[in-house]
Amino acid sequence: MVDYSPGERRSQWDRFGNKVSLLVVLLLLTTTVKAWASDQIVVPERIRAVVAAPDRSEADRALDPGRHPAEMLAFFQVSPGLRVAELGAGGGYTTELLTRTVGPNGVVFAQNNRLILERFAEKPWSDRLAKPVMRQVVRVDREFDDPLPPEAHDLDAVFIVLLYHDTVWMKVDRSKMNRAVFQALRPGGIYAVVDHSAPPGAGLDDVQTLHRIEEKTLKQEIEQAGFELAGEADFLRNAADTRDWNDSPTAAGERRGTSDRFVLKFVKPSGANPKPPAH
């Protein structure tokens, strides 16, 4: 046994203490990263019941494995009584999940523009809106530059799911769109964004050919409107995705639902002044 002097023992203890402190810091950082990545999302039973509802269509259920609706609703904190909106609702897969979750005391403003309705969605959208479960949905036919009506204010959340990239090739003024969303949300309200990931450096190059957008570019655009990034989730990530194929619903075929997708939670800061859309 080595007999250290008091000074040497103190030095040894200091080094040990430094190592312990470093270990604690690393553990805290690891915990923070896990919370930020949201790889352990707790799904409330009420949300599981929404997804498992027996009157949901078989077509919607077939999309569930590739969309993880329970995790999405839980991550974005959708609950009964909320006022929410969806931009680019399309045929209404996400809209129906939202209205089932917010329930009879909530409301969902569901927007489509003319192009989406005329080319893809009018028939399935109208058919879905006729279902009794959709009675809390307000149909909104407006362009993306000014997507929400005046009555859509103090919203708890606004969703745009797998569609932000389309607003690029549709020549939408995205700066104006994002400011309109900012204005419609209450302080602390959530801008919920899900989209297909393009490789680093791609920027906006793949928005029409591959229906993908670079995550960094999208973050920059939304943060410029005044939003703060409050969280990310990885339940739609796929590291095996080569990100060089077209993942649009009509082109993806059997690969639909397997693309690498980012899930981002932006928040309107509490006390933020409204930022009206530019005219």
Model-found features: residue ranges?
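Conserved class I S-adenosyl-L-methionine
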Residues: 81-90
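A short glycine-rich, Lys/Arg-flanked "PGG" loop and its adjoining helix->strand segment in the class I
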Residues: 99-100, 174-187
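S-adenosyl-L-methionine
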Residues: 120-149
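A short acidic, Gly/Pro-enriched loop at the edge of an enzyme's catalytic core
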Residues: 148-158
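A conserved beta-strand element that flanks and buttresses the S-adenosyl-L-methionine
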Residues: 159-163
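Conserved beta-strand signature within the Rossmann-like core of class I S-adenosyl-L-methionine
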Residues: 188-196
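Core SAM-dependent methyltransferase catalytic element
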Residues: 240-279
